[in-house]
Amino acid sequence: QGHCARAGAGVCGAAIAAKKEGVDVLLVDKGVLESSGNIGGGNDHFMAVLNEAEHDTFEDMRKYYVTPTSGITDTIAYNFYKAMRPCLKVLEESGIELLRNPDGTYVRSAGFGQPGPWWIHINKGYTVKSKIAKYIKNLGIRVVNNFFVTKLLKDGDRIAGCVGFDVLKGDFVTVRCKTAVIAFGLSAQRVSTNSTRKPFNCWYSPYVTGSQIILPLEAGAAVLNLDIADKGTL
């Protein structure tokens, strides 16, 4: 059995891929699948390098992302590149409308100083997460909402589950698994990346608590570059 913690876009992708390989998947989140994660607020664009236009190749992407200070390697960039078309397939299978030109190609724009038109436009992007949630449930992936993970459980050197509580009922919950994918968020939005100190005035999800750092650390994982990456919390 596989266990995917937090139901943002990243772990939804992991859950879908695992399920399609025949794994029994349980997905848990402290919120609700239909609205959790950064994507829960909607999104009107998706980045994909498709070899269909000028400056639209992996080499263009590699030159942009793999720099001495980015922390991104050739392998990381290539794995990202390989996942783009499969992700597009899932999005369209979910019923998400990616805008197209009359010739059938995607409507795309350049952005963020990137050399090519890598950003595909999405119609009614506020529906993205709810449609992905429906797609996940139709695959038969089990979902536990409102479950806040407080500690990872170990069996030797591997993660064997987690414990936490239902944020609405207060019930204590234990999950056991053979393999875990943990994607609790990128930063700690309540403190480090919000200069106004207003908790909901931020770009990404305001509900990222820093547990993506402390829970693996408590379980014995190494944490690198926390002092320079602005991902910490008080």
Q: Can you annotate each of these PLM segments?
A:
Residues K30-K151, D155-A160, G164-D166, D171, ...:
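Conserved N-terminal/central alpha/beta ligand/cofactor-binding core
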Residues A17, Y135, L215:
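Rossmann-fold NAD(P)-dependent oxidoreductase module
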Residues A14-A15, L88, I213:
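Generic hydrophobic/aromatic pocket-lining and core-packing "Φ" positions
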Residues G2-L27:
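N-terminal Rossmann-like FAD-binding beta1-loop-alpha1 element of flavoenzymes
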Residues I182-L234:
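Glycine-rich loop(s) and the adjacent beta-strand/alpha-helix scaffold that form part
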Residues D24-D29, V223-N225:
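Short beta-strand "acidic-cap" motif of Rossmann-like dinucleotide-binding folds
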Residues H3-A5, T174-G185:
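Short hydrophobic core segments
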